[in-house]
Amino acid sequence: IRTGLIGFLTALIAVLLIVFFRKRAIALMVILAMVLLWWGRFPAGDWDLFICDVGQGDGYVINLHDHRAIVIDVGPDPGLIDQCLRRLRVTTISLLILTHPHADHVAGISGARKGRRVEAEWIGNIAAGSTATIGEYSIKVLWPLQVGAIDENPNNVSIAAVIKSRDLTLFAAGDVEPAVQEKLRGQIGRVDIYKVAHHGSRFQDLTLMRELAPTLALVSVGEGNSYGHPAQST
């Protein structure tokens, strides 16, 4: 997700070239276009949220600038998450949130740590009511209810949190199932972005989804996965 700063700067530079160089403007604009095409292969510095291609799993990166980021889950493949973070030029993970101990969310951990400093890590050591402020983002944990929570279904001990900045509100809930989603009703309100629980499976609490009323709903899945994610009903 980007803000379009590159497009604005491109137009501004083009106008300045025409005004000040005239005859050389066309040649210079061609060179500029080639540079921008090359530059465009890499994420702009003004992006807020990036979804890593980790296959059937989750891997989300929130930009803190200066090569720092918040990372939510790391997918199943160390190589894929490492490749993504290198592409984004992330050298410091200010907060690594591993929502729950399933391979499609945590097995890539060695790749995320490779050559990077991890300043704080949440997995099973955080509970509802906990808060943090990292850069311009505030984070409020809504689930699980206690540290070290245990459930016969590990999905239901996923870390669920609201992450806010001045311009963005994101709700991410790992793989929590409807029984937990119901308990989160009335605690969140409207959000800009909802990281849909459990890869958009058919097990969703529609009342919560209506309360969230997200502008953008994100689902991370592997192409042709055997789980039927995302469900058509979702």
Where are these regions (language model features)?
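Non-globular, low-confidence helical/coil segments that flank catalytic cores
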Residues: 1-234
